[in-house]
Regions:
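Short Cys/His-rich micro-motifs in 6-15 aa windows
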Residues: 252-262
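An accessory alpha-helical subdomain
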Residues: 201-220
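Catalytic subdomain that performs nucleotidyl-dependent activation
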Residues: 123-207, 262
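Short, flexible, mixed-charge glycine/proline-rich loop motifs
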Residues: 224-234, 240-245
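Short cysteine-rich clusters marking metal-coordination/redox-active sites
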Residues: 237-241, 250-253
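Small/polar glycine-rich anion-binding or flexible loop at a beta-alpha turn
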Residues: 188-192, 217-222, 233-237
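ATP-dependent adenylation/nucleotidyltransferase module used to activate substrates
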Residues: 1-146, 165-178, 250
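Cys/His-rich microdomains that often coordinate metals
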Residues: 69, 244-246, 257
Length: 262
């Protein structure tokens, strides 16, 4: 990497409390550094009455901070969630997560972004950990790191999660204190997702056993060094979209094929 080249830092922003707090804080910390430019990237999943509203909050903060804001859509690069959910009873987060990650990586490459910051908080982290354990997906546990990943490749833009150990309620308190105008409604498909009962379970455990979320996080971090990663993970180019994939066809293109045939 050219040390004289200006560094581009992307922040994935939905318009919610976590991503806008992250954007605000990074701007406070890095805003005077002329060698670093911060950009906001929003993914519009095509959920009417939800994402179209939260985008307004994302745009408002970017404008007030003087940050460039880019919007990428499922309609352009995948299929809108409202259309998907008309024809399937599957976990909506499965489709949404795959499409969003694919689009974010593509957006970062197009915008020449060096690092992408994501607003996952402590609650998100332990919920994701528990989901991956229940699905018996150790490699997903290994991939979901505070920074970086398990494979270094120039086509995979590194991600960082600066809020990974901060409880959701503290982020809400900070956002309110700073006067950050965030969108506070829940995704209309959240109740159909596996994450929802896991979130309820962990929150109930936290009430009965205060501090359990932090203990889960500590356990998760210790797992990272014990999960066996294949020495040479083969990275291929998807035969359809030509993006990086661990298989001949990436998950995004597999999903699109399934949806077309359903």
């Amino acid at each position: 990497m050219n040390p004289l080249k200006k560094k581009e830092k992307g922040v994935g922003i939905s318009g919610g409390k976590d991503s806008l707090t992250l954007l605000y804080t990074l701007k406070e910390i890095l805003g005077e550094n002329r060698k670093i430019e911060i950009m906001g990237i929003t993914i519009d999943e095509g959920i009417k009455g939800y994402r179209d509203e939260s985008i307004k909050n994302a745009r408002e903060l970017c404008d007030s901070l003087g940050i460039k804001h880019y919007i990428y859509t499922f309609k352009e690069h995948a299929k809108e969630m409202d259309e998907i959910m008309k024809n399937t009873r599957s976990d909506p987060c499965s489709y949404c997560g795959v499409f969003r990650r694919w689009i974010l990586n593509k957006a970062c490459k197009e915008l020449e972004i060096d690092v992408l910051a994501i607003g996952h908080n402590l609650d998100d982290t332990v919920q994701t950990l528990q989901m991956n354990i229940m699905r018996n997906e150790p490699l997903r546990i290994a991939r979901f790191r505070p920074s970086g990943g398990i494979v270094e490749n120039e086509d995979f833009i590194p991600r960082i999660r600066p809020l990974f150990n901060i409880p959701e309620r503290e982020i809400v308190a900070y956002a309110l204190y700073k006067g950050i105008n965030f969108y506070n409604s829940e995704c209309p498909y959240a109740g159909q997702a596996l994450r929802n009962p896991i979130r309820i379970f962990i929150n109930n455990m936290e009430k009965d056993y205060p501090g359990i979320k932090f203990r889960m996080l500590k356990s998760y971090l210790s797992m990272l060094d014990t999960i066996k990663i294949p020495e040479k993970m083969k990275i291929e180019k998807c035969e359809i979209c030509k993006e990086n994939s661990s298989n001949k066809t990436c998950k995004r293109c597999q999903f699109l094929k399934e949806l077309r045939n359903s």
